[in-house]
Amino acid sequence: MNFLDESFLLAVSFVIFIYLIYRPAKKAILNSLDTKIIEIQEKVLKAKKLKEDAALLFEQTKVQIQKLEALRSQMIEESDKATQKIIQDKTKAMEEFLEQKKADAIQLIQNQKLIASKDLQDEFCDEVITLVSKYFRSVQLSERSIAKNLMDKSDFAHNASHATHLH
């Protein structure tokens, strides 16, 4: 093998050519790879940041949901209390109304009872007067003798009660 052989020189020249081309290309490839690595690292950092932000947002949302649940429970409890109070107030008002109506009805019944009793007394008195008048007319007494009889009986009753007071 001859070192000056053309195929050997061609091979050495090709290796040198590749080396000379590879050297600047190596820098460009390494720079390109470094740039890609930096871009990927930035994307990974952004993804981590997004993940952390999402986790933080999730926790904040979870806290807000818990607060809303507590607020909802409180509102339900307050509305239940308000409803119970309204029911109690309306029940009390209804009971008072019914008691008032009951008292009014009792008063009305008593008034009607008094009116009916007075009407019966008036009818009874009218009937007694009519019967007494008919009796006195039937026995053919004059009005004067009727009045005298009534006066005598009235004086007798008055004297009798006066006499009992003296004893």
Curated annotation (Swiss-Prot):
The chain crosses the membrane at residues 7-25. The keyword Metal-binding does not apply. Keywords: ATP synthesis, Cell inner membrane, Cell membrane, CF(0), Hydrogen ion transport, Ion transport, Membrane, Transmembrane, Transmembrane helix, Transport. GO terms for molecular function: proton-transporting ATP synthase activity, rotational mechanism. Coiled coil: none annotated. It holds the Pfam family ATP-synt_B. It is found in: Cell inner membrane. HAMAP family: ATP_synth_b_bprime. F-type ATPases have 2 components, F(1) - the catalytic core - and F(0) - the membrane proton channel. F(1) has five subunits: alpha(3), beta(3), gamma(1), delta(1), epsilon(1). F(0) has three main subunits: a(1), b(2) and c(10-14). The alpha and beta chains form an alternating ring which encloses part of the gamma chain. F(1) is attached to F(0) by a central stalk formed by the gamma and epsilon chains, while a peripheral stalk is formed by the delta and b chains. This is ATP synthase subunit b. It comes from Rickettsia typhi (strain ATCC VR-144 / Wilmington).
